[in-house]
Structures are given as structure tokens and as C-alpha cells.
Amino acid sequence: MKKWEKEIIKTTIKCKAVHASIVLVASAILSSFDTSAEILLGSQTNALTRSILRWDVFHFLSRAMNSYGGWRSEHEIAFMPGIPLLMRGCGLVMATIRDAHTLTLSDTLIASAFLANLISLLAPLELYRLTRVVYPHYTPAQAAAPALLMAACPPSPPSLLVPYTEAVYTPLALMTARMVAEGSWLTASLVAFAAASTRANGCLLAGFFLYEILIRPVLETRRLCFPPRIINRIAFASLGTIASFAPLGYTQTEAYARLCPQAPFCTRTLPLAYSYVQGKYWDNGLLRYWNVSQIPNFLLSLPVYVVGIVAICNPHMTLRALPHYVLHTLTLILLLCFSNVQIALRFATALPPLWWWVAAHTDSRLARSFVAWSRLWGCVACVLWAAFLPPA
């Protein structure tokens, strides 16, 4: 492992240790605002298990404890099967090690949190490797700067400490983008499938395959002609696109088969259970989150949106960087206009242009303020997480 990769891993481990310590100490000291975790865990309740079982982990755990990892209630359709399957697998491994005959909640939570931490360690490292590919003229130190910033000040540290979508999706999404750019298209397709199995918007990773394999070669030659080995390229672009959409397609097909024709979404022009469930249970939809009661969530996530928009307006644009800025812009629009806006705090780690801009403008007041805010808010978020207080 190279010098800067070792430095990034060491920084990530140190910062994770700080955030995990805050969560565990706060969990041991503070009582939960919501006692659902204690009720569900019963005798398996302790500071560690209680600190893991928060927010979306309830939904993941419900599916993980199901014999086949599937959903039981329709609101669980909003969550992709990747994390529940990972949790179930971890729980079964722990049960085997302990020579137990049953799958327990505590085994499942603790083992999956351990694995999620190992996987999320790769996120800053993959950002570094991706930066080296996108900006090959950068020195190793320049490429490491965004990764070190991500490692030191993620806006939502708890989501990287537990079996959550961010802990798994972020490194896999960054890995997908890097591998596609490097030409490892088959491996990238497998990684994209794994990433898309954890989060619905993983289907957007298909854009990297289409752009890098088919579009960028044409833009580089500046001639409207087929790139070399066009049949081979079309095949791999199709494979990557299918791999990116397959998990979402499967979950929507399963939901349609199990809920239709009774469910209201079945008669829509595009009968997607995902958008129906998001709107029904989380009030997602075009500008539906834009109301007075949500002002605190807008204010909490404002720094991410401000820096994210500034990064779009001041891009370090190259042909290799273009798809990252397109996905970055699309993600911000979807979050701001169609989703729970505070989710941007968790999504930030999967937005390379944000970290590229901050690292390139550390002499600006906005970048310095963002770093200071991220560090402070990250610690506060750990305490709020331990006490089972929003934002999720």
C-alpha cells in the first residue's frame, strides 16, 4: 500500500474511533428519546446494541430476521435488499461461531456493524484512487487532500458506523466509477450491482458505463464516429447498465406481483412501488417537503447544498470529470426537490465534486467554514444519534 493510501486509512480509523467513542459514551449516559430499540432488544439491550439500532436500521433488521430477507410490510419496499441480506449473513456467521442454533438480534447488529465499518473504511481510499484517475496530473498529495477531508469531517458520521446504506454504497459507488474509467468494465458491473442493491439511486451508476465506454471516446476525438471495438463496447455498456438497474427492477417487479392489482400505484402509467411508498410513508414528492415545519431540516443541511452548488458553479472540469458533475447535480436536484432534504447530510460522502472543491479552495472562507461546521456537526450528530433524536 502506498504512502498516501496508508495515511488515508490511518486518518479514517482515527476519526471513526473518535465518532464511535462519542456515540457509545452518549448511548451509555443518555436515555433514548424513543424506547423502540430497548423494547425490541429486551434482554439483549446494552449501550452497543442500542447505539446501532436506530432509524433505518429497524427496517433493515426486520428484513434481515426474515428467513429470506424479503419485506413483510409495504413500507419496507423503500429499502433495497442489500443491507438486510448483509446483516442476515453476518448474523448467521456469528451464530455459527458461537455454535448457536438461533439467529439473535444482538449477533446480527454487532456483526453487521463491524463489517459495515470495515467496508466504509474504503470510502476515502476510493475517493483518493478515483481522484488519481479523474485528474491524472494531480500529485499524490493533491489527490489525497479530498479523501483526507472526507475521512476527517463527514457530515453524518453515525451512518458510516452502523449497517446503513451510506457505509456500503459510498465506497462501492466510488469504486464503480473508478473501475469504469480504468477499463475494468466487467468487474465494475459486478460492483455496480452490489452498490445498486443497497440504494435505489444506484441505478444512476449506469451513466458512468454509458459515458465512459460510448460517449467519452467520441468527445475526445471530436468526430461523430464509432469508437474502436464498438460491438464490444456496446456489450459492456449494456452489461453495466443492466447491472445498475437490475436490483431496482427486481424489487419493483416483486412489489407489483405481491401488491397488485389492489394497491393504488398499480393503475399508474409507470407503476413504481418505490415512488408510491416514498410518498405515502415519507411524504416524498415534488416540493412536498417545502413547508414551514421542515425549516430546521433545511437549515441543518444547508451547508451541504451551498458547497455542493458552488462546486457545480466552479467546476474543475475535464472529460473524465464530466459524469461526476452531472450525477452530482442530478443528486442535489433530487434531494432538494423530491426527497427529505436532510438526507443530503448522509449523501455528501458520495459526492466527489463537493470534496474536490473544498480541497482545492482551503484558502477560501466558505471551504474553511464548511470543514469547521462538518467537524462540529459530526460530533453533535453522534450525540443526537445515541439519544435517538433527529435528523436521521
Annotate the PLM regions.
Residues 1-42, 235-236:
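Start-transfer (signal-anchor) and selected internal transmembrane alpha helices
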Residues 18-31, 52, 193-316, 320, ...:
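Membrane-lumen/periplasm interface segments of specific transmembrane helices
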Residues 51-103:
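Short hydrophobic/aromatic helix or loop-helix immediately within or flanking a transmembrane segment
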Residues 79, 83, 87-91, 106, ...:
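Transmembrane alpha-helices of multi-pass, membrane-embedded glycan-processing enzymes
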Residues 317-338, 343-356, 365-377:
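Transmembrane alpha-helix segments characteristic
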